[in-house]
Amino acid sequence: MINSEDNTSTGLKNGGGPGYIMTVRLAILSRGPRLYSTRRLLEEAEKRDCYVEVLDPMRLSITVGNDEPRILNAGWPVEVDAVIPRIGYSITHHGVALIRQFERLGVYVANSSDGISHSRDKLHATQLLTKNRIPVPTTCHIRTWQDVEGALSRVGGMPVVVKVSEGTQGSGVFLVHSEDRARELTYKLLSEGNHVLVQEYIEESHGRDIRVIVVGGKIVAAMRRRARGREFRSNFHLNGTVENIDLSDEYANVARRAARLLNLDVAGVDLLESNRGPLVLEVNSSPGLEGIEGATGINVAGVIIEHCMIHQGFSNVGLDQLLRSRPGHGVVSVNINRHPILNGKQIGDVFAEVNEQVVFAVAREGMHIWKPRRTFMLRRGDEIICYGEIDKIHQQLTPWVSHSVGNNNASPSTIEFSEESY
């Protein structure tokens, strides 16, 4: 345990010197203590008199049981106020388990376990973004090389981008100009056990993108990255060039929403500049700091540390578990497009026999309307999100949603509810 008199058990440093009264106990989870980003975070934490240490996640162990959960470092309990995860792709599974354990202990973690898991799976991230009307390049997930021809047609034809669902710093991303090459590459990637995506190629954004750093829902810095030579990937890691830019409101709004929807307090959002506006290419939960600090002159590391200092003591809550903890209760959603009979109806008409508020949100055009009144009128494209007793919600909705799309005589057994975690 760390305290102001003895900080030897976990090795966390007293940045303020002997006798300094403890402020924030901070751990940076990283396997690369000499990497630029890790060193900068450590430096800025020490400037602010934090107790701080870089901890190798592969040297930490987890104890789970009926007693209080624990995280051990060389046999000593790790007791901190805030954690900044810098988890590499190769140890995502263990890293996410560690973060989940810190969350159980009530420790603030800069990026939640769910946020990291979602962002590391490109397909899952794309599904979450598009569900909330965040613009992305058209993307197809394929399971066999025979699916390539159909995928090419759906994303707009050649050339296309072929990528693996999990990867970082531009690895596993290929620009392909012929169908034969796309089929050959897909076969190779699938045979290696990868999940493969075929993605629309945005010609007007060839070799460049915009990296936006979002911390706590605020835009901290933005830069344009350009590839060198014949390379089409613009990653700084791949020797691309960077320049500071002033971000437009449209691009800033998309970046903020993408980070928020993936539940990331610290995110690097990559945007393509297309003829139809900003497109989210990827959301990174461990964005590199060297390129962005060099291009903009902004102390991004300092902003991250100050954010953690402010939020230490407040842990992330798994809302899905909370909503399911009450027996018989849960979340039910209904899409108006699938049940057009609800179009033009008021919420009070649908739930006429329920006095309490059952509909806690309506998703409309990428936004959420919270706690809508009973007089709120539904329209096409809306999604009703309800919370309460599952059986009671189903009972109220059944007479309405039994009129399914293309089958107005559908029986209750064909009703389609979607029970989800929000």
Residue ranges and their predicted role:
Residues 2-7, 12-110:
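ATP-binding N-terminal substructure of ATP-dependent carboxylate-amine bond-forming enzymes
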Residues 102-104, 375-376, 394-420:
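Short, compositionally biased
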Residues 20-31, 36-43, 52, 76-78, ...:
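Active-site nucleotide/adenylate-binding loops and adjacent lid/helix of ATP-dependent enzymes
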Residues 316-352:
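Extended boundary segments
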Residues 24, 246-324:
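ATP-dependent carboxylate activation and anion-phosphoryl transfer catalytic cores
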Residues 171-262:
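Phosphate-binding site of ATP-dependent enzymes
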